[in-house]
Amino acid sequence: MLYNENNAPRRIIDSSLEILDLFTSPQQPFDMVVGILNGFHGKFINKLSDKYYYILNGTARVEINNEVFQVHSGDFVRVPANSKHSIDGRLKMLIICSPPYTPSSEEHCSE
C-alpha cells in the first residue's frame, strides 16, 4: 500500500498543531501521522501510548518529564507513556503512537 500526506485527512488539534492522518488502523499496533507545529503544544500525559517524533524539518524545544531537548531535522524523540511532555517550535514531524492514539488516553496538564 502507498500512503501520501497530500491525500491524508487533516485535523486541526489546536491553534498550534495540524495533523495529517497518514496511516491509522485499529487492526495495527501503531498509527502514524504527520504533525505540522506552529507554536506551543502541551503539556500532556498519554496514559496508553508511547509517542515517537521524527523531525522532518524545522526546530523545536521538547520537554519530557522536565528534561529539555532542542530538536532539529533528522532528530528522533521517544516519549514513553505516562510522561509529561510538551513541544514548542515550528516544524514538520512524523508522529508514531504505539498502541494507536486515542483522545481519551491523553490528559492535559496544568503545569
Identify the function of each model-found stretch.
Residues 1-33, 109-111:
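A short, N-terminal "cap"/entry segment at the start of jelly-roll beta-barrel domains
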Residues 81-107:
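Ligand-binding loop in jelly-roll beta-barrel domains
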Residues 31-48:
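Conserved short histidine dyad/triad with adjacent acidic residue
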Residues 65-82:
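Short acidic-glycine-tyrosine-enriched beta hairpin
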Residues 52, 61, 76, 84-86:
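Short, surface-exposed charged micro-motifs
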Residues 14, 27-29, 47, 71, ...:
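A generic fold-level signal
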Residues 48-61, 65-66:
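Glycine- and acidic-residue-biased ligand/ion/polar-headgroup-sensing regions
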